[in-house]
Amino acid sequence: MTNIRKTHPLLKIVNHSLIDLPAPSNISAWWNFGSLLGLCLMIQILTGLFLAMHYTSDTATAFSSVTHICRDVNYGWLIRYLHANGASMFFICLYMHVGRGIYYGSYTYLETWNIGIILLFAVMATAFMGYVLPWGQMSFWGATVITNLLSAIPYIGTTLVEWIWGGFSVDKATLTRFFAFHFILPFIIAALVMIHLLFLHETGSNNPSGIPSDSDKIPFHPYYTIKDLLGFLVLILLLMLLVLFSPDLLGDPDNYTPANPLNTPPHIKPEWYFLFAYAILRSIPNKLGGVLALVMSILILAIIPFLHMSKQRSMMFRPISQVLFWILVADLLTLTWIGGQPVEHPFITIGQVASILYFSIILILMPLASLIENKILKW
């Protein structure tokens, strides 16, 4: 008799995705981030669901409902901080996952890569709207500043912004709709994840060498199930360290002041995971130009597959590209730092140099390095 997991219509899908899936024998810990992102999404949906049971999306009560969750709900503080810091872990895993894709040339799987970019945008939108919900000072002013950027769109900009706000400023209507979208988007993300995996399983995983691994496959279970579980353990440990020892480390103290439209905080800045894009936005003195640079800083990922000039897929055997890749990582860290600094000398100049370098590495230097490496191969 054939095993039920191979015949049952539902279990068959699980079997082909998680048990009998042929996987490369040499994928490193950098391939753990996909499953870690799945874990993060599950943590966020569960903690978010329990938070939504006690949260009220009304300007008069939103802030106090969050306070109520932290003070009066059983383990409410734990759920709230798991959700807030879970978002940080989510973005750490996301950026590592994307970085891995760039380093090892995984972007050559076009469909998987493009769904991944859509997922990145969806997660960023969800995180932004979630940050508005506690209705603190940074929530309110962050929402005001970021939504206002859309007014830079010619002709329809102002109308669009007022349509999104549901009025002439960020107010009750805005908060209510942001809560609605923040609730629905993670489920859309979960559906997109399924499509992401569907396309990935059409080709199979890439591996560090970038060489096809069809001749050397191992079953996903038990090898990579146990490896993923170890990853889960490390992620949960780090998340718990953050939540139980310094839950407000990555947050903004301004968000413990209730939203006040009459009082602007001295430094409006987003959460740390958006600071690099915020720095790129601020480094251009023109509003529309800044918005375009902001969008392009993420959308540039869609161009990367077409800039692949190398004869090799992975950067494993490409020292010049490796150096450029790590300069790019350092540049992104610099941008993250600059995004959190006030707009004054020398930070303005550093931000502008780092922004130019960011686009130069991806659009010009990386393809050039690939061509040079191709030449070196012939020597």
From Swiss-Prot:
Q: What is a single molecular function from GO for this protein?
A: ubiquinol-cytochrome-c reductase activity
Q: Where on the tree of life does the source sit, at the highest rank?
A: Eukaryota
One GO biological process term is: mitochondrial electron transport, ubiquinol to cytochrome c
Kindly list the places in or outside the cell where this protein is found, as annotated in its UniProt entry. Answer: Mitochondrion inner membrane
Cofactor note as given: Binds 2 heme b groups non-covalently.
A GO cellular component annotation here is: mitochondrial inner membrane
Residues holding heme b b566? H97, H196
Membrane topology category: Multi-pass membrane protein
Q: Which positions are annotated as binding a ubiquinone?
A: H201
Cofactor dependency = heme b
This protein's UniProt keywords: Electron transport, Heme, Iron, Membrane, Metal-binding, Mitochondrion, Mitochondrion inner membrane, Respiratory chain, Transmembrane, Transmembrane helix, Transport, Ubiquinone
Instruction: Show the stretches that span the lipid bilayer.
Output: 33-53, 77-98, 113-133, 178-198, 226-246, 288-308, 320-340, 347-367
Binding, heme b b562? H83, H182
Name any one Pfam family assigned in the record: Cytochrome_B
Name the InterPro entries on file.
Cyt_b/b6_C, Cyt_b/b6_C_sf, Cyt_b/b6_N, Cytb/b6-like_sf, Cytochrome_b, Cytochrome_b_C_euk/bac, Cytochrome_b_N_euk/bac, Di-haem_cyt_TM
Assembly behavior: The cytochrome bc1 complex contains 11 subunits: 3 respiratory subunits (MT-CYB, CYC1 and UQCRFS1), 2 core proteins (UQCRC1 and UQCRC2) and 6 low-molecular weight proteins (UQCRH/QCR6, UQCRB/QCR7, UQCRQ/QCR8, UQCR10/QCR9, UQCR11/QCR10 and a cleavage product of UQCRFS1). This cytochrome bc1 complex then forms a dimer.
Outline what the protein does: Component of the ubiquinol-cytochrome c reductase complex (complex III or cytochrome b-c1 complex) that is part of the mitochondrial respiratory chain. The b-c1 complex mediates electron transfer from ubiquinol to cytochrome c. Contributes to the generation of a proton gradient across the mitochondrial membrane that is then used for ATP synthesis.
Q: Which family does it belong to?
A: Belongs to the cytochrome b family.
Question: Any other comment in the entry?
Answer: Heme 1 (or BL or b562) is low-potential and absorbs at about 562 nm, and heme 2 (or BH or b566) is high-potential and absorbs at about 566 nm.
Instruction: Give the protein's recorded name.
Output: Cytochrome b
Question: Which organism does this sequence originate in?
Answer: Lepus timidus (Mountain hare)
